[in-house]
Design a protein with these regions (language model features):
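Outer-membrane beta-barrel porins/channels
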Residues: 1-413
Length: 413
């Protein structure tokens, strides 16, 4: 069974970019404290081999997106500065899915209490390709000299694959002939994952007649780790209207704030990441209502609706820093999700056929990179809700509509 599809493509355009809303400004801010000799390579030094160097900082320094304030210093300027006329574009393509294979057993006691136990094996595959670029006039390579015109494009490719296992337990009690109560618990899915990634910057700058052009690439990297997904708890109730139909309600609690990462070869590799998850992520609540009406003894019609809350705490939509890993800086923060379903079912003897259509509607915020707070003693305004920002990206609204059709054919033995 396909549990989730990651397939989607989207793009955004930006105008009026400043140093505080440029990707180069973001990289410059993150690079404070790193010396020129650390981030820029030489004949006998590869900065990517230095485990203390973030690859994003090295890539920015080697492609002139950031430039040192002094030849040997540890402070950096963005190529986009005061008076620079800048526009930008972002494109993203995501593909992949989560597929689940279930092995179940079940039974009942006096046709009143029904139980089921299952083991689910999961395959996880995710690919993302992105490109973020800016073109400008009046940029800076040498401090204080707005004499650079040109463009750059940063590309990222990330592939994640893995497999996991979890246990599902469910019970249903027939309280009366017409009323049913149900409960289910799904353990966390325990994944073993591998990330493979690479990034590059292609650039073409003209500094008062002096060209700076080229292509800088990171090495191809990979990383193995473990991931524990949230556990889920489901409560349900249903009422059966004789032979003519059924109405059901479901509530699902997903402990999103309890998911975690682990590196089996390091004690604290994900310590900070797991802390950030508990700070930024809240549990998800899903409410479902569905009905089935039997048109004839063989044909039934179905209708359903589900509402899912956002897993992101609201304060992180208003300028808080969202740390990202590696060179892939863009991300989305999902708001609520709505699901609408309709279907038809056919039953005859030992054969059944079900057809269903589902429409998913979701809103998100699209960030080309994270906001970064200003380095001041009090990083918040007096009302303590909005941080003062050194880096403030242009945030876009993203709405996606997903349509899917499912056809199920079954035979009872």
């Amino acid at each position: 069974n396909k549990q989730k599809s990651f397939d989607r493509s989207y793009k955004a355009g930006y105008s009026g970019i400043t140093g505080a809303s440029s990707l180069s400004g973001y990289i410059a801010h993150l690079s404070e404290g790193y010396y020129v000799a650390d981030l820029r390579g030489s004949n006998n030094y590869n900065p990517y081999d230095n485990l203390s160097n973030p690859w994003l900082n090295v890539l920015g320094a080697e492609s002139y997106l950031i430039n040192p304030k002094s030849p040997t210093g540890d402070s950096w300027n963005s190529i986009v500065g005061n008076g620079t006329n800048t526009a930008g574009d972002l494109y993203v393509r995501e593909k992949g899915s989560i597929d689940e294979y279930n092995f179940n057993v079940g039974g009942n006691i006096y046709n009143v209490f029904y139980w089921g136990l299952g083991i689910a094996v999961t395959d996880f595959s995710y690919d993302i390709q992105s490109g973020y670029g800016e073109n400008f006039t009046g940029g800076y390579i040498s401090p204080g000299s707005p004499n650079v015109d040109g463009w750059y494009l940063m590309r990222n490719a990330l592939h994640t694959n893995g497999s996991g296992i979890k246990v599902n337990l469910g019970v249903i009690m027939r309280a009366t002939d017409n009323f049913r109560l149900g409960f289910a618990f799904h353990t966390p899915n325990y994944y073993k994952m591998t990330d493979s990634y690479v990034a590059s910057v292609k650039y073409d700058f003209n500094e008062s007649g002096t060209p700076h052009e080229g292509l800088k690439e990171t090495p191809s990297g990979s990383y193995d780790y473990e991931f524990q997904s949230p556990w889920r708890m489901i409560a349900s109730a249903a009422y059966v209207f004789g032979q003519s139909g059924i109405l059901s309600f479901d509530y699902e609690y997903t402990s999103s704030n309890n998911m975690s990462f682990d590196d089996p070869y390091s004690v604290d590799a994900f310590y900070k990441t797991n802390q950030e998850i508990t700070e930024m992520v809240s549990p998800m609540h899903t409410f479902k209502i569905g009905g089935e009406f039997r048109i004839t003894p063989q044909i039934s019609a179905r209708l359903g609706y589900a509402y899912q809350t956002s897993p992101v705490k609201s304060e992180y939509r208003s300028g808080r820093e969202i740390p990202t890993a590696g060179t892939l800086t863009m991300f989305t923060l999902d708001r609520e999700t709505n699901y609408f379903t309709v279907g038809l079912g056919y039953r005859f003897s030992n054969v059944y056929v079900d057809m269903a259509y589902m429409h998913r509607y979701r809103r998100s915020e699209l960030f080309p990179f994270s906001p970064l707070p200003a380095a001041v003693d009090n990083p918040y305004n007096p009302d303590q809700t909005e941080p003062l920002l050194a880096i403030s990206p242009q945030i876009s609204s993203l709405t996606d509509h997903n349509n899917s059709f499912v056809l199920t054919l079954g035979v009872k033995f």
